[in-house]
């Protein structure tokens, strides 16, 4: 699968997108497909679930006097006040206000976020919220019409609507941080600064993605996080406050030029293993402090996004094999099973 280098949509000058449609994350019922609606009917169905997220950030350095501010979008996914948005939108945020479709502003707080998926969960206390229906569709088709809804540039007058098609599926792009975003929907629906975190909706009025990134050097190429890929993690974010990843007993670090220089590495790609615990799965399986992981079950690894995505691809198999730079044999790691989630309060 080709990995395309791209730029994330910034907050108040970044380039990000919208979110989506299916059953409530606390429900196990899959919603059957509705009839196709007109675009105005789709907008009428979803618009009240789309919010504006206004942020004030922490100064990037002590020399900065004024904190930066920004705006983005989000989508209500639960009557209890949970809102799905992008991690890049809330990173370094000092305070946050959420603008509802009614025009009301209410304080918001980040309750979970994950930089590898660029996903965040915001919580507000408000009454009469209208959650969107999330739709982790496995049958989304190239050429299918989709609608992006968000609040680009924090313009007055409510959310903005753009229409396009699914241009491609299962895209992977490289972020400026050197990590890879996977399972992206490519669309030609216009995504602009401030659209980040808003929904990409199919013509049944259900969210199939969360708008996240654009290709700045190309025309009509935007990307959304696939709801099919992120939906399994939403309940964990609501209950645990984080996305579940197995505790293998080491700290993975993406190898960058600065990491190479700091540790005197001769390998220029992969994931560096630090703080290996000899009593946990990685150490028991033969991983040593300072090892460089270059593949997981023969899937090449260039960064932490690659590493965790490869582990997810392992499915229910009990072990994975890590290929290590400069070592003849792999390390075989036994994967721990996740603890059962308790019902959300």
What does each model-found stretch correspond to?
Residues 59-67, 111-117, 155-158, 169-185, ...:
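Gly/Ser-enriched beta-turn/beta-hairpin loop segments
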Residues 20-64, 70-73, 82, 95, ...:
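N-terminal activation segment of mature serine protease catalytic domains
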Residues 48-53, 74, 81, 85, ...:
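Terminal peptide-recognition signature
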Residues 125-133, 161-219, 227, 232, ...:
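Active-site region of chymotrypsin-like
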Residues 69-71, 92-93, 192-196, 279-280, ...:
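Short, small/polar residue-rich loop motifs at catalytic or cofactor-binding pockets
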Residues 1-28, 41, 109, 141, ...:
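C-terminal recognition in membrane/secretory proteostasis and scaffolding
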Residues 53-56, 79, 86-87, 111-113, ...:
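Residue-level recognition of beta-strand microenvironments
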């Amino acid at each position: 699968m080709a990995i395309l280098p791209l730029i994330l949509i910034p907050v108040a000058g970044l380039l990000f997108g919208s979110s989506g449609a299916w059953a409530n994350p606390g429900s196990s019922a899959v919603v059957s497909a509705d009839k196709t609606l007109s675009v105005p009917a789709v907008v009428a169905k979803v618009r009240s679930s789309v919010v504006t997220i206004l942020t004030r950030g922490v100064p990037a350095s002590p020399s900065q006097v004024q904190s930066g501010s920004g705006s983005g979008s989000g989508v209500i996914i639960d009557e209890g006040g949970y809102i799905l948005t992008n991690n890049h939108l809330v990173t370094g945020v000092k305070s946050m206000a959420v603008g509802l479709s009614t025009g009301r502003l209410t304080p918001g707080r980040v309750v979970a976020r994950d930089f590898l998926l660029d996903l965040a969960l915001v919580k507000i206390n408000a009454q009469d919220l209208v959650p969107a229906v999330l739709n982790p569709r496995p049958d989304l088709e190239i050429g299918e019409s989709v609608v992006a809804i968000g609040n680009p540039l924090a313009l007055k007058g409510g959310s903005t609507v753009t229409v396009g098609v699914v241009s491609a599926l299962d895209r992977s792009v490289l972020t400026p941080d050197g990590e890879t975003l996977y399972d992206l929907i490519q669309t030609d629906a216009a995504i602009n600064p401030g659209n980040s975190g808003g929904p990409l909706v199919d013509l049944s009025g259900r969210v199939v993605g969360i708008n996240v990134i654009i290709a700045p050097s190309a025309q009509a190429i935007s990307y959304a996080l696939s709801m099919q890929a992120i939906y399994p993690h939403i309940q964990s974010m609501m209950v645990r406050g984080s996305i579940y990843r197995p505790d293998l007993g080491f700290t993975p670090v993406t190898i960058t030029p600065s990491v190479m220089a700091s540790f005197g590495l001769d390998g220029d790609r992969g994931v560096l293993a630090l703080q290996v615990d000899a009593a946990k799965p990685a150490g028991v399986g033969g991983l040593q402090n300072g090892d460089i992981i270059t593949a997981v079950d023969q899937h090449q690894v260039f960064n932490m996004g690659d590493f965790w995505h490869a582990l997810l691809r392992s499915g229910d198999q009990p072990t994975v094999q890590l290929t290590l730079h400069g070592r003849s044999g792999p390390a075989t790691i036994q994967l721990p099973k996740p603890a059962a989630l308790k019902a959300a309060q």
